[in-house]
Amino acid sequence: MPSNLRDKPLIACLHPYVEERRKDIEQGLYPRHHLWGIEDIEKEKNWRTKTISSTSVQVPTLLERLLDRSIFRGSPGTKVELAALRASRISDLVYSVCGPLALAKTYSNKLVSWTFRNPIDLGSSFKLSHRAYRPRNLSANAAFFCLTSKSESSYANFAPSRFIPWCVDMDLFDGLPSAGKPQKPFFLATGKTGRDYCSLVKGSSLVNAEVRIIGPSHQKPDRIPPNVKWIDTSKDPPDQAIDYPTLREWYAQCTAVCIPLSGDSDDTCGYTNMLEAMAMRKPVLMTHSGCLDIDPETRGFGKLIEPQDHSGWTDAMNYILKDKKRADRLGEEGRRMTEKEFTIERFNRDVLKFLRELLENRKELVD
């Protein structure tokens, strides 16, 4: 290898969830924002990159299950952890889209992790499990990327942290009208994590419109009113039930997007769903979140509903149905915001800027 290449720092990228998705992303069948900046990290000329793959890691099945339920509980799992540890031996930084890793203390201060919520309160009952979030382990990270300003303040107690707002694939979610019109108006709700579909379903019974819910069966209420259509996404990946081109069409056809959340004030659940709806020019009806830095009502692209308030869902949906022009204005404001604040290009620039700063600081320490 030429010496000028050997002299360049090496960033190892850990993102096992898209190992088999790169081709789909290139073909526009899967959202590009799920790359988390890796496409531009790979193009950067000031460093080299390596993709961490867990497929070559061999662990006996019983041992893997034991480790996944103990030491690696709350982390991406045994094979991913071991693959990342091996890559850290030859890398200057390990860029983890999987969140904090349980073996961070063995990385020689090279691990840079994305965080999606405030540090988990482990309490006194945890010993081996969730060790990725133990204070000593968090302090061993080189830095943190944070989706919210609230989490930036929390993780800054352990390592340098940078708040970078999320983004959305505006080529897939292009905001254009649907090729066809639905037979009747419908609201759309989708998502598997941190959802409160019981409140939404109960509130839907007094709304003169269909409500389509794309969610796992274990979150499905026992009683479903006639105007609610449930699409099961129990299997992973979720787009086995409905692919993204079809989901994009449903976004385009729906009256508004509903995001009923469980009310966890430290979780960013619903963020991606919200941005996809905004990009598609749809009003966002969403449970109040104590974590996200934007909300639909304050910024003028939707309505907020209090946690577990089924009547609030009824009122919000009827509010949208009552005035189509008002609903269109809310949707247009959401699209305007995504074009200005939540593009992939802006997100990737912010990620690369922080990585450059971290590498420069490491170089100064070595010099």
Residue positions per predicted region:
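Conserved catalytic-core segment of nucleotide-activated headgroup transferases in glycan assembly
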Residues: 25-33, 179-247
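Membrane-proximal helix-turn-helix segments that form the acceptor-binding/catalytic region
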Residues: 82-90, 119-144
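Donor nucleotide-sugar binding/catalytic pocket of nucleotide-sugar-dependent glycosyltransferases
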Residues: 140-175, 189
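Nucleotide-sugar-dependent
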Residues: 238-245, 249, 257-275, 286-294
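A short alpha->beta transition loop at the rim of the catalytic pocket in nucleotide-sugar-dependent
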Residues: 255, 281-283
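Conserved acidic donor-binding segment of nucleotide-sugar-dependent glycosyltransferases
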Residues: 298-310, 319-325
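A short, well-ordered alpha-helix in the C-terminal region of glycosyltransferases
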Residues: 319, 326-341, 350-353
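C-terminal alpha-helical cap of glycosyltransferases
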Residues: 344-367
